């Protein structure tokens, strides 16, 4: 059975991201072993730039994201559902992504990756916004999420 990570990045309970997440979770039932992150319900901090991950594998912070590195390493697919705020990501998603600095440093500074770089992984992002559509509406979010997905070797 495949392993999936589903991230609901909305700070709003019962909003669009929740409905989309529920739909996706129903479709994955019985087809995937799912780790479901509802970021608004989790207690964690962003990167504090302490430098620990530049000298050691992993992150010194022990909170609800502590197992994130293992979960992403074991995953076959990652699905992120997020609203757009001022062309960007909600703060908790950005804080989670900033904590992936430990993965980046393990790969490129320590050359001892926390993520199996040979394992193929798939990723999907569902973004939605309330503003009238305009050409660059999703670019800020796309840029940040591209870095996140690259850090976990996901296309």
Where are these regions (language model features)?
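Short, glycine-/small-residue-rich phosphate/pyrophosphate-handling segment
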Residues: 109-152
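Beta-strand-loop-alpha "switch" segments that mediate conformational coupling across diverse proteins
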Residues: 155
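N-terminal beta1-alpha1-beta2 submodule of the flavodoxin-like/Rossmannoid cofactor-binding fold
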Residues: 1-105, 110
């Amino acid at each position: 059975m495949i392993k999936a990570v589903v991230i609901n990045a909305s700070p709003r309970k019962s909003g669009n991201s929740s409905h989309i997440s529920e739909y996706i979770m129903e479709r994955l039932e019985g087809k995937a072993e799912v780790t479901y992150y509802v970021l608004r319900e989790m207690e964690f901090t962003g990167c504090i730039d302490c430098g620990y991950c530049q000298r050691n594998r992993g992150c010194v912070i022990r909170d609800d994201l502590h197992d994130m590195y293992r979960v992403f390493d074991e995953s076959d697919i990652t699905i992120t559902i997020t609203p757009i705020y001022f062309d960007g990501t909600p703060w908790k998603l950005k804080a989670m992504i900033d904590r992936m600095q430990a993965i980046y440093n393990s790969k490129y500074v320590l050359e001892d990756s926390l993520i199996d770089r040979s394992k193929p992984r798939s990723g999907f992002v569902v973004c939605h916004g309330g503003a009238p559509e305009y050409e660059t509406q999703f670019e800020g979010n796309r840029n940040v999420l591209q870095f996140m997905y690259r850090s976990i070797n996901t296309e």
